[in-house]
Amino acid sequence: MKKVTAMLFSMAVGLNAVSMAAKAKASEEQETDVLLIGGGIMSATLGTYLRELEPEWSMTMVERLEGVAQESSNGWNNAGTGHSALMELNYTPQNADGSISIEKAVAINEAFQISRQFWAHQVERGVLRTPRSFINTVPHMSFVWGEDNVNFLRARYAALQQSSLFRGMRYSEDHAQIKEWAPLVMEGRDPQQKVAATRTEIGTDVNYGEITRQLIASLQKKSNFSLQLSSEVRALKRNDDNTWTVTVADLKNGTAQNIRAKFVFIGAGGAALKLLQESGIPEAKDYAGFPVGGQFLVSENPDVVNHHLAKVYGKASVGAPPMSVPHIDTRVLDGKRVVLFGPFATFSTKFLKNGSLWDLMSSTTTSNVMPMMHVGLDNFDLVKYLVSQVMLSEEDRFEALKEYYPQAKKEDWRLWQAGQRVQIIKRDAEKGGVLRLGTEVVSDQQGTIAALLGASPGASTAAPIMLNLLEKVFGDRVSSPQWQATLKAIVPSYGRKLNGDVAATERELQYTSEVLGLNYDKPQAADSTPKPQLKPQPVQKEVADIAL
């Protein structure tokens, strides 16, 4: 009995010691100018901007996992597409009169040009090294079948020729030509099937995880930058002087510390919403989140991989979210080519792949529960789509693959669970709540804290998204001559549009291609194509989009 009592006493003393150590550690306050929460591409990009704009500012980055770029930025957890609307048909919706709207496509392409310039600048500075390790030329293709879809693609191609950003795109309805572009897609296909494709040679495959690792490795070379891994934010509290005290737990030894920061960026992917809510700023009350995961079929068989060099996107079926369309993609991951097909939607209440099953429930509040209910009621087709995706069998997924690769063999493919994407639900005065595709920077009025919510186009537009954040929270500094000069050195086209300026477009594409080691030839005259037959479109209920 005495031994048991002694043992219990020793355990109590030990636990008390750990608790006291944690409190003591928490009382030791670390000070920093900028706190970056999350070790993904958004935090890495913002940190890289600020390092060049204000090299004397101290920065601290905290990451919950044991390494950076292990969640959504990880190359295996996303599609690795340099989203520039060259092939993604959801960025060019069809109007009621049958015409094609290209405004969104132009905006997406402009944004990706900023990312290309940002990365090229970092290569020139030696921050990013060996461009082939993170970006490679992979042609981007759109591929459709059926008379209505062919007519849509024909009209899309014609509309995009109005923009200097889409020069060099080619169009074909010829089976032999499309087979030359994408053999896997055409071999074994019915020769009588009506098909069409566009192809743009300057498309890219991007390893965002590698970019993130290299950017953070460069930041770590400076003494006023600190990276803390296995560190989870437990509390955020605004101080009277508008600084923030952030409590961070060390997940390895159980201790905690307080970090006092002048500015806090929440770039924690799916976890950003909960942390934004934890901050208590009123702007957070407008938002809720709904998690959707994605799966891909993966082939590493050389007979498959070496027979396909393209990212091929199709058109979503009627009633399905526009971004849900499957695509068969060449990827370059860790120096090795693979082919991915998907995505297939999955559901989990986790907000992160390495998150908690309680994430959805714990982020639901009295402020956002009604917007969530409105979104569910207003988008029943989306709910049905997600349920149908979750119910897919192995055979169902393989049949979907065969629509894009008719001669596919089951033994060449395995299923891979990619990352989680938290869709933005925002309070709306008219509808109660709306599902928002895209990313959104949410900040307080004082510009002392900001969070990035949303999922698409995400990593491919990290550079322009963080530019937007700088303008939103550091407006006075951004307008200063010093910051203006630095930003224009980082992004030569900063402050002006490339669209409509052929010379400027070609100059920037030539520059970034040379620095990043990408293929680029001056575009030739556009292909002659049959004139699109614009047909009035039946009025259809708008389908909410989601990012997979």
From Swiss-Prot:
InterPro entries: FAD/NAD-bd_sf (IPR036188), MQO (IPR006231). GO terms for biological process: tricarboxylic acid cycle. Keywords: FAD, Flavoprotein, Oxidoreductase, Tricarboxylic acid cycle. Its EC number is 1.1.5.4. Residues 521-548 are annotated as: Disordered. It catalyses: (S)-malate + a quinone = a quinol + oxaloacetate. Its cofactor is FAD. One of its GO terms (cellular component) is cytosol. It comes from the Bacteria. Residues 530-541 have a biased composition (Low complexity). GO terms for molecular function: flavin adenine dinucleotide binding; L-malate dehydrogenase (quinone) activity. Pathway: Carbohydrate metabolism; tricarboxylic acid cycle; oxaloacetate from (S)-malate (quinone route): step 1/1. PANTHER family: L-2-HYDROXYGLUTARATE DEHYDROGENASE, MITOCHONDRIAL. Belongs to the MQO family. This is Malate:quinone oxidoreductase. It comes from Escherichia coli (strain K12). The gene is mqo.
